[in-house]
Amino acid sequence: MLFIAISLGFFVENYREVLVDRQKEKEIIASFINDLETDIKELDIVIQRRETREIRIDSIIYILNNGLQDDYGKDLYYYARYLPRPAVFWANNTTNEELKYSGNFILIKNQKIIDTLLQYNDNFIFIDFIKEREEYLVRRLFDQINVLFDPMVFDEMNVYDIEFVYPSGNPKINTKNKDVINLFLSNLHYVKTVNVGQLGHFKKHQKKAKEILNFIKEEYPDVAAEKRK
């Protein structure tokens, strides 16, 4: 009888630990779902702004290539003022980082989920690399912006927000020197190229996030159902 009682005690304790681990696993999965949903929403905003940036860059190139800067000075200044401000994606990978450092990935019993999430997290490394490359190209472009554009016009365009307003009148650029303009366009080309690359990568990343989110919800329908309540 004593043996049975001891065995039963071990069984109850082990069962309790299983329940606790299962609850922790569900909490981790719910946290991952939150991270992915946040990423998807954030990427919606970033993608839209990147598409707008592409239009602005193409407009600048068209205006300057066709010698229309005197006709579209207001637009030129407005588009140029946004060049140093590419939309940045900040990945919400808090849960992934916490699990890597705590070793609690072991609580997730589904190995496919673990592999998928780790692969998703690896994409952030590439995103950060491209972000650094873009920052370098934008810094190079600053020198030409300072030569071509009147800082007092830019100052007029400031508002108490992260956005800008169109300048009044039809301001002119500082020079019509072709060498100066071509140098600006050359550097702008590289900024455009990295923006196109970023835009494509963000779209792929968002698609992957949606696929992973659906996969997790299929594998953990109870967690998904609980979140919908």
Regions found by a protein language model. Name each.
Residues 1-19:
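Membrane-embedded hydrophobic alpha-helical segments
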